[in-house]
Amino acid sequence: MDKHGIIESLLYTAGDEGLDEKQLLEILEINQAKLSELISSYTSSGLIIQKFGSTYILTSKKEASPYIEQLIEQKSNMKLSQAAMETLSIIAYNQPLSRSDIELIRGINSDGAVRTLIARGLIEAKDVENSRSHALQTTDLFLNVFGIEKIEDLPTTEEDEEEMDDFFSNLVNQKGDTK
């Protein structure tokens, strides 16, 4: 693989955070002049390498904006079902939980909702030590999507009712843009 392909792969893997120039120089074992030359000669049909300060980021070209906006709009129309929202709330406040625990709380089979939440990356199944079962818990993506740093930041019944209403309003209006 040539250096362009390696840079592209590294920046793709780094995602929105990009990579610091020093990291690229170190990994590629090249000097700054060679890196600048590689970046300026990089060509791709839909991607571009941009520099922000000392950080390089792989991003889409401006010409792709209308298509990307259309994709985002389509994804924003994919809301979570009421069952998925209920299941997510139960898991968030009571984690870790087994599927049977969720069904006891909801009073109905929740397999479909659990599958949806796992597919969206909002929850994950972890192996329970010394057992063949799994426990469901929220993911870091859940925290990111709902704008909280840690699970303890969820509003509690002791907190202001308006804050809880706002949180659950945001939860219910969650567009499902989790990929």
Swiss-Prot record:
Q: Where is the signal peptide?
A: none
A Pfam family recorded for this sequence: SMC_ScpB
> Does the keyword field hold Cell cycle?
yes
Subunit info here reads: Homodimer. Homodimerization may be required to stabilize the binding of ScpA to the Smc head domains. Component of a cohesin-like complex composed of ScpA, ScpB and the Smc homodimer, in which ScpA and ScpB bind to the head domain of Smc. The presence of the three proteins is required for the association of the complex with DNA.
Where can this protein be found? Cytoplasm
Gene Ontology biological process terms from the UniProt entry: cell division; chromosome separation; DNA replication
Q: What is this protein called?
A: Segregation and condensation protein B
Which keywords label this protein?
A: Cell cycle, Cell division, Chromosome partition, Cytoplasm
Role according to the record: Participates in chromosomal partition during cell division. May act via the formation of a condensin-like complex containing Smc and ScpA that pull DNA away from mid-cell into both cell halves.
GO CC terms for this protein? Answer: cytoplasm
* Family stated for the protein in its record: Belongs to the ScpB family.
List, alphabetically, the Gene3D superfamilies matched: Winged helix-like DNA-binding domain superfamily/Winged helix DNA-binding domain (1.10.10.10)
Superkingdom to which the source organism belongs? Bacteria
State where it is primarily located. Answer: cytoplasm
Q: Do the record's keywords include Cell cycle?
A: yes
